[in-house]
Amino acid sequence: MNIPSDNIPGRMGLNLTESTPAIKQWAYPWNAPGQAIESPLPTYEELHRRDRENAALACAQDLLQKQSVIVRMSVNAKVNKLEKEQGVKRANAYLAKTFLERILPRVNIVSERYHIGKMTADTVRLMYRFNHLPDMSKEDIELLAQDISTFITMELSSINDEMPEAGELKVLHSLYVRAARITQAFRQSAPDFEKLMRRYFDEPQAAAALSRMMSDQWWARRLRRHAAEWREHLHIALNHVCKKVSTYASKQMIRDWKEQKRRTREFLKSMELEDEDGNRISLIDKYWGSVANPAIRRTEMMVRIRGFENVCNELGYVGEFYTITAPSKYHATTIHGHRNRKWDGSSPADTQNYLRTVWGRIRAKLHRNDLRVFGIRVAEPHHDGTPHWHMLLFMRPEEVEQVRGILRDYMGFWFGIG
């Protein structure tokens, strides 16, 4: 029996073709797939992750509060900027991860070079103030210098009572040793220490050195310099000295330098020179007309180099221009302005000492090979303040390849020939 297709059960009223999409039907509405029910409570994994993040954030905040004002202001400024632009979560991540893993180790390396780690009972208050030198004003540094000089004077006064029958030389030696130990405890080198203690103890020289260590003005100069180096080194560690922020030196150092130059100009303007006949001339005019003027000093240097080159060419020498720089570990910042992970905490002064040491070895090698070179050398900073040297050396034409080979051997690929 032939049954029309329209009368087949399940096909009534349907004209199925290959192009008709399949329609899913469910016996009951609750059989249809729905959205999964999510628990309103966090999972154990989320709770543990949140606890770890909160603990890391609290640890970072606690460590940040122990840092100097320079570090706190820099990190807080970055955190506030991230919170404003990308939200609280991104700002907390920067504080808990970037600060702890990248910034804080660099800051600790720098601080260990300048602060006093082990304190004694009699100088604990002075040393505590000393460890806050980067945050101290000029007046606070001068007050600390007075207190240290007073402490040294009081310490030395007890030596005379302890050695009533000793000779003058022995007493002077004991006074110098005690003062030198206190000076070294405050991260300063005692005057003429190597010469007096390891070569010959000269009484007049020791008395002069002892007088300096008891002077508050001497201590003020030393502490101001120590504080300035400490602050600038912290700025370098915080990546404040680079092409993206401030080239060659930090903004604070540049402001201080300009202020010092301004005070010097004001002092020179207020002074006059007078000869025996009563003729007077402004001291500032003589200053700007001498080599103290940077423009005149630079012009004189260029003229001297050109004249030096002309004389050497007439004598048959040839000139070679060399540029030597330090390895990557001496650079706090990469060429693109990012933090250098290979940096070992070296300061620009450390880099300069490294270049001097290597150049001393090169000179010794040249001397052993009977190669006589002479010329002019200048130091120039990279964008992160790390110095490199430019040297214009003159030598005999037949000695050029030997000199180049020696520089290659000692400098490796850390040098260039122009």
Task: Annotate each predicted stretch with a short phrase.
Residues M1-T386, F394-G418:
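Positively charged, glycine-rich low-complexity segments
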